[in-house]
From Swiss-Prot:
This is Cell division protein SepF. Residues 29-43 have a biased composition (Polar residues). Its main location: cytoplasm. It is found in: Cytoplasm. Homodimer. Interacts with FtsZ.
Length: 218
């Protein structure tokens, strides 16, 4: 019996050691499980914090964008005001320039018209030659493009004939025209003047029939 009791005691001793080891293993496993759970909780808490941080960053970006927009709007308004203020000035300047150009253009046209009229203006001179030397003065007027109305009533037939020959030759050289307009009157015209005279019957009373120029005899 004593041997059996000692044997049982030995068995129970070893059994208690195994139980203690098992308990220690269980405690260690529980200790390992607890930190893992805490780590999982911490890890799960971090994803919750990240969206919050993203949301805060988005709010900050939105505020910064609003501030930049608010800063841009006054500048845009000032630029529009400046454009609106400068536009009437530019419009007035354009109107003034157009008025000046129109007035200057009108003045230039007037000057050109006056010059052209002065250059194109034709003068008719009335001459009563009394001697042969007066024919040269009549030809000089033709050179400056003046019309000359010649009346030979104060000249003799021979002198008048010589004057007419000289004037007729000069008119042909200067491309003028010499036409009879009366019993003792002739019209000398330059090349830039056209003369249209209606035919008329000139009485030949008291005139020399043999004289080709129909000059009065005095």
């Amino acid at each position: 019996m004593a041997f059996k009791d000692t044997f049982n005691k030995m068995i129970s001793y070893f059994d208690t050691d195994e139980v203690n080891e098992v308990e220690e293993d269980v405690a260690a496993s529980t200790d390992n499980v607890i930190p893992r759970s805490q780590q999982s909780v911490r890890a799960s808490s971090h994803p919750k914090q990240e969206p919050r941080n993203n949301h805060v960053q988005q709010d900050h970006q939105a505020r910064s964008q609003e501030q930049t927009r608010s800063q841009m709007h006054p500048k845009h308004g000032t630029s529009e005001r400046y454009y609106q203020q400068s536009q009437p000035k530019e419009g007035h300047e354009m109107v003034d320039r157009r008025k000046r150009m129109s007035t200057s253009g009108i003045a230039n046209r007037r000057e050109q018209y006056q010059q052209s009229t002065c250059s194109d203006q034709t003068t008719i001179a009335l001459k009563y030659p009394r001697k042969y030397e007066d024919a040269q003065e009549i030809v000089d007027l033709l050179i400056v493009n003046e019309c000359v109305l010649i009346d030979f009533q104060f000249m003799l037939d021979a002198q008048a004939r010589r004057c007419l020959d000289f004037i007729d030759g000069a008119s042909k050289v200067l491309y003028g025209s010499l036409q009879k307009v009366g019993s003792s009157m002739y019209l000398l015209a330059p090349s830039n003047v056209s003369v249209n005279i209606e035919e008329m019957t000139i009485p030949h009373t008291t005139q020399d029939i043999g004289f080709d120029f129909d000059m009065k005899r005095r």
